């Protein structure tokens, strides 16, 4: 009995100590629900729909509030004003990468997505400069995307108008574009290496968006001591990285420093230039992780958006008809669509923006962190605190986008039918950590979709009213449900 009493007393003291430590720090941090000892607010969150949970909390605590994932505080920013104030008005202070334990374990603070501090700044600056040198935003890259769009059309013709799952084919096109940028060549859609890479990328997107991965983010100790899909994620990343390491080795053997061919060549030249510097960030290991980041980010986000776009076109045949009418009128049948067409196609442009707004691909963004102690809206946020910015709350703001849960390209059209920009359009995030490939992704979305609709009528195997567009995952990413469709040649 004495032992039981001692255990109860000890546990009570630990709980009181935990509550005191958290409440003493909460005087400086924004308000939020009272966390439980050790586990924090985890049981107050719906890990299958974190966005919904954050919206509920914001109604109680306002647009800036604190949640505890385990024993660590995380500040949540909800709504356009709070997100803009942090990421744009205080961009430098909110530019650090926040905690993402599953990725940190794999990337080891290297690459462009999950690195920190000066290392991240140097690699990002180099990446943006190199992408510009390779023609990003210029005709060179546009030519590559147009060529891949033509290959995509030929591959879709091979389906002979039969029902098919578009996942793999729609993944191949953006993947080939990023491959041409990284190591200068594309794959045939039947190439076995390509099939394997695409399978790994697709599986990883599902794993990252699963409740288990969200749970591992709250309790990182699970990554080391519990089996789970995070081990499959790591194996898939290492498989992709090993393939890219072979490409790097081939480039080392054929490198001509006077004539760089692609991203790997530019990096190897920089690596050689800094070989004398023992503190250089430009190591071969960092190269392998950076190109893996580019490979994954440049493929899955665009392919998922394309897949969702076709599903929404099937669901809304009246929208499809308007887009196809505009394509017929502006582009016609005898040439490929080009980026110059977009300014004369306001409805199609509005449609592409509405797809990205509506699907809300990365609902809570990648986590940020503050680079220093900062006073934000009369709260003191300590250096290193993880920041979650709810992009959903911006993209689905009912004041900016009336009836935000309805898919309507009119959200981006003015009263005269002209395209209307919105500061609330943040699918690529904002500020210092904004997606480096935004321009490429928007180009691919426009050219791939217009080329598909120029050449095919989309036919659903279900009646439009029976098509479900609800995402099957809503964690890291919102992924569309499985569906099939027919590509009927025009």
Swiss-Prot record:
Membrane topology: Peripheral membrane protein
InterPro entries: Cyt_P450 (IPR001128), Cyt_P450_CS (IPR017972), Cyt_P450_E_grp-I (IPR002401), Cyt_P450_sf (IPR036396), Cytochrome_P450_fam2 (IPR050182)
Modification type N6-acetyllysine: residues: 249, 375
GO biological process: arachidonate metabolic process; long-chain fatty acid metabolic process; monoterpenoid metabolic process; organic acid metabolic process; response to nutrient levels; response to xenobiotic stimulus; steroid metabolic process; xenobiotic catabolic process
EC numbers for this chain: 1.14.14.1
Compartments in which it is found: Endoplasmic reticulum membrane; Microsome membrane
CDD domains attached to this UniProt entry: CYP2C-like
Entry cofactors: heme
GO MF entry, a single one: oxidoreductase activity
Keywords: Acetylation, Endoplasmic reticulum, Heme, Iron, Membrane, Metal-binding, Microsome, Monooxygenase, Oxidoreductase
Residues reported to bind heme: 435
A single cellular component GO annotation: endoplasmic reticulum membrane
Induction: P450 can be induced to high levels in liver and other tissues by various foreign compounds, including drugs, pesticides, and carcinogens.
Catalytic function, reaction form: an organic molecule + reduced [NADPH--hemoprotein reductase] + O2 = an alcohol + oxidized [NADPH--hemoprotein reductase] + H2O + H(+)
Taxonomy, superkingdom: Eukaryota
Pfam families: p450 (PF00067)
Annotated function: Cytochromes P450 are a group of heme-thiolate monooxygenases. In liver microsomes, this enzyme is involved in an NADPH-dependent electron transport pathway. It oxidizes a variety of structurally unrelated compounds, including steroids, fatty acids, and xenobiotics.
Record-stated family: Belongs to the cytochrome P450 family.
Protein name per UniProt: Cytochrome P450 2C6
Species of provenance: Rattus norvegicus
Gene: Cyp2c6
